[in-house]
């Protein structure tokens, strides 16, 4: 069996790995570490939980330690870009843990945290800078960081980093980097169009694919439940009554959708937290900590926000909404069955999501088993719904009244208004709304029901 020492990792890093409890490299580490140590560009494909971070962090730390030099004021030698705050923080922690005996400096910058404190951390220069693209460009615009000294560029979760939402920021950042650099892309999935885009940032890269992106993680029991969209929340409640679901990661398609799911779960008595881009950094950190410590049994997340969630004992992944990109399904269910554990992935499939399910099964080359349940999954048919009230206070159908001609209706309403006024009551606006007119016969009320604002007519000037 290959060891970290066989891969050429230095003694101080071996000591740190031993302290962290690492005994043998994973397949992605075995293949990627020698390539990175040799200074080659790399595209590394591996599912989450396979040790991607160590696959680039270990050789980078070795290279920086072997050629020690000061980066320079406000500069960095290695730049690692990540799509989310959680992933950036996790990568920063990994660099510090693996390099604890090397004396190298690491800084992490992302939105939602103090810009001033980040400027202080960057002022003297750092060996490793981990950043989200938006916050990095904030520092660039304020001249608190410079990128002309970068020797190694890393993009983690490259499939999302190079998605259209990030590509413009990345192109700006690329113009600030020296052309003579080593570039590394690591990701769980890399569809061909994204790979072509990545090639623009890499120079003759090596490609390592330990696990094909279409292969679902081992030890994950998969199931799908066909259910109408408006029954998904009730189905989720029914599933969570099963106490074997000790820690569930639920995927929602939108931020507002995630909040709605959590609100209804809490109303039903379940401990749940949401994590997505609209949450502040403090809220996201607290939600993730509550989930890790077991204070929240359910964490509802969007696709992007889930990147960087590092929790080994997730018992169930629930796709409340099926992803419209099949590779994301593979990435999602890889959040369970980590660290040699087994796990369960359950997907809710509404009628309008069946095409997504077909794409997933086509990609993975396997049929997702249908899970049988006693829960009523279909929306009630028209003749099964509760009867509507027959009339006011349930006293039976209203009497059909013959419609009055419009003119008669107008006079009747006007007469009623005058009689009402004589009794000392203000005219009813709701009753008179269609009948109040000016001298020209135009309605006085606006469409919104509010009276228009009149201006005093000015006398004509001579």
Give the residues covered by each predicted segment.
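Arginine-glycine-biased low-complexity disordered regions
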Residues: 245, 267, 293, 311-313, ...
